[in-house]
């Protein structure tokens, strides 16, 4: 424990000060508004409330914050809602959203500066063609084939909000900012409860996405901080090189023994490290830890993670959140794919002079497929089909024009095919295409008070073309002269794209809450 405390103190020495005054600068809220516009996804299936940015309202908010007893009254009388002006619903919503997003931007500054000034790290060249979530799968395909055990780790949601604030004290000593953070969190939780309710967490996640991502990623960062500490203590290998990336999502080059990567704290994070015997990869709240060691070593690691989370995070980590399996006998769900490492047997004929003999060869291969059941469940939750996968109409879109309805359905279908292009079996994707196509037809028929058959006959080939991905058309032309397969009917070809920087909402059901 003494080593752990010294390790924590070394990290604490890089704290930043005085970010609170930035809350009184108007340009901070302009940045928050610009982020909200860039973060809007046109394919999003859940409702999105367009909030108009008003510099006049921002100035009024800043003037009110300058008042001497403004924060005191807001904290002492939260029910009166003096900050959010509860008498006017528009002001209440606007002030809550813009102030929390601006506050999240301010809190991100010391974290970014801390990573930029982190001493002792070598500069690693950046590869723009590896800024993709799909880049992790070639890495898994190369490394996981030689490993033995796999641990599935489910990182729990943040615990009591007060512990979140205490964790931030390791990186920020700006007391007014920490008090203001407590003030925000007071709206989403009951401070008398020992454990934060899931309802409060999802409310914060829905209404204040940037602040939620910052808090959650800060929490996960502390979790992985101790994982890195344990790795240093348990291995005699010297960490030859390490690196920190501030890109949104960046994949590290292959280094000799060790690599660290995580993006800005407010984005969805992809983080991994590697050494000759152990590999760790995480995206959001799910992580996998694979190693070459024995079963006893993996059980010790599980015990370490449970005990350290109890000691430092003051949270009882349920042992069942860390599942241990042999890699060759298990499937794991990660980044929207169901992956496994099966052993395939090949019969090879070898001929020497006049004699020939057969060789039974075994090979491991990382097999990635699109899981049909979770994806159909996501479509059902988004009201495109029933729980059994039967297509239904989308009544909320009947007010749109016919072209907008076709465009939305077609874009969702193209995004699903684009993200799951690395699937070795495409049957599930064709099933999703059928559901979306028929749901689109029923939506149009409902709008025009007609039947599905009438609209299928009326639209014809134009309706079908909307549901072919651009990638299928492009690749079928590119490889027409050099290959003998067609991407329109292929069920086994896998393609990894280098332009996917976020996980699709349908692939990640948590974003639909």
UniProtKB/Swiss-Prot annotation:
Pfam families: Intron_maturas2 (PF01348), MatK_N (PF01824). Its main location: plastid. GO terms for biological process: mRNA processing; RNA splicing; tRNA processing. Keywords: Chloroplast, mRNA processing, Plastid, RNA-binding, tRNA processing. Usually encoded in the trnK tRNA gene intron. Probably assists in splicing its own and other chloroplast group II introns. Belongs to the intron maturase 2 family. MatK subfamily. HAMAP family: MatK. GO terms for cellular component: chloroplast. It comes from the Eukaryota. One of its GO terms (molecular function) is RNA binding. The gene is matK. The keyword Plastid applies. Signal peptide: none annotated. This is Maturase K. It is found in: Plastid, Chloroplast. It comes from Sporobolus indicus.
């Amino acid at each position: 424990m003494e080593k752990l405390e010294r390790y924590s103190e070394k990290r604490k020495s890089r704290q930043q000060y005085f970010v609170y005054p930035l809350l009184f600068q108007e340009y901070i809220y302009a940045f928050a508004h610009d982020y909200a516009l860039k973060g809007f996804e046109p394919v999003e299936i859940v409702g999105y409330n367009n909030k108009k940015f008003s510099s006049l309202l921002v100035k009024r908010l800043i003037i009110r914050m300058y008042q001497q007893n403004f924060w005191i009254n807001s904290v002492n009388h939260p029910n009166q809602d003096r900050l959010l002006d509860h008498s006017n619903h528009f002001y209440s919503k606007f002030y809550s959203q813009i102030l929390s997003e601006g506050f999240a931007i301010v809190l991100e500054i010391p974290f970014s500066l801390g990573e930029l000034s982190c001493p002792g790290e070598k500069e690693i060249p950046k590869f723009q063609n590896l800024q993709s979530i799909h880049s992790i799968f070639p890495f898994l395909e190369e490394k996981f084939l030689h490993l033995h055990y796999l641990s599935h780790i489910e990182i729990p949601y943040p615990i009591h909000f007060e512990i979140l604030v205490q964790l931030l004290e390791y990186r920020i000593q700006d007391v007014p900012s920490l008090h203001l953070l407590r003030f925000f969190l007071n709206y989403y939780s009951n401070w008398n409860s020992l454990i934060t309710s899931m309802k409060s967490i999802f409310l914060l996640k829905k209404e204040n996405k940037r602040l939620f991502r910052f808090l959650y990623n800060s929490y996960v960062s502390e979790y992985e901080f101790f994982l890195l500490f344990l790795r240093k203590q348990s291995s005699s290998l010297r960490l030859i090189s390490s690196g920190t990336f501030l890109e949104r999502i960046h994949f590290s080059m292959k280094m000799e023994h060790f690599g660290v990567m995580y993006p800005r704290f407010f984005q969805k994070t992809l983080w991994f490290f590697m050494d000759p015997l152990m590999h760790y990869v995480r995206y959001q709240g799910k992580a996998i830890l694979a190693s070459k060691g024995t079963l006893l070593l993996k059980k010790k690691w599980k015990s370490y993670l449970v005990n350290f989370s109890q000691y430092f995070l003051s949270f009882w980590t349920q042992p069942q959140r860390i599942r241990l399996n042999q890699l060759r006998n298990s499937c794991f769900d990660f980044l929207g794919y169901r992956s496994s490492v099966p052993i395939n047997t090949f019969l090879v004929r070898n001929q020497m002079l006049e004699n020939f003999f057969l060789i039974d060869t075994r090979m491991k291969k990382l097999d990635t497929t699109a899981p049909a059941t979770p994806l159909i469940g996501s479509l059902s939750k988004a009201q495109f089909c029933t729980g059994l996968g039967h297509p239904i109409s989308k009544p909320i879109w009947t007010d749109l024009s016919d072209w907008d309805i076709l465009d939305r359905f077609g874009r969702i279908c193209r995004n699903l095919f684009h993200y799951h292009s690395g699937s070795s079996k495409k049957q599930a994707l064709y099933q999703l295409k059928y559901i979306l196509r028929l749901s689109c037809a029923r939506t149009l028929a409902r709008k025009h008070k007609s039947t599905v058959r009438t609209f299928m006959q009326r639209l014809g080939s134009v309706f079908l073309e909307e549901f072919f991905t651009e990638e299928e058309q492009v690749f079928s032309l590119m490889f027409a002269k050099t290959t003998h397969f067609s991407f329109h009917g292929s069920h086994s070809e896998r393609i990894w794209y280098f332009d996917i920087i976020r996980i699709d909402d349908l692939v990640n059901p948590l974003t639909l809450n």
